[in-house]
Amino acid sequence: MSFPSLLFLGFSGVLAFGEVGWVGVYPPGRGMIRVRCVGCVVGWLGLRRVLVRGGIWLLLHPGIGRVLCLYLGAW
């Protein structure tokens, strides 16, 4: 999965602080990876983190104040 794809999922995943739910599937027609997102408020930290299953961390948009965890994999 490319970095722009992860970035898109990061922006579209959390619609409200504290939201927990299923974003959808990615990529279409390629194994249909289900993406689960968990958003929570971390204003003091000021970071958005994306956790890719396997232990890769990406820091996106310092100052936003949310943590977004994307667990990628086939459940």
Swiss-Prot record:
User: Is Transmembrane among this UniProt entry's keywords?
Assistant: yes
Q: Name one GO cellular component term.
A: membrane
- Span-the-membrane segments of this chain are 4-26
Q: Which UniProt keywords apply?
A: Membrane, Transmembrane, Transmembrane helix
What is the annotated localization of this protein? Membrane
What membrane topology does the annotation report for this chain? Single-pass membrane protein
Principal cellular location given in the protein's record: membrane
Q: Supply the name of the protein.
A: Uncharacterized protein TP_0250
Instruction: Tell me what organism the protein belongs to.
Output: Treponema pallidum (strain Nichols)
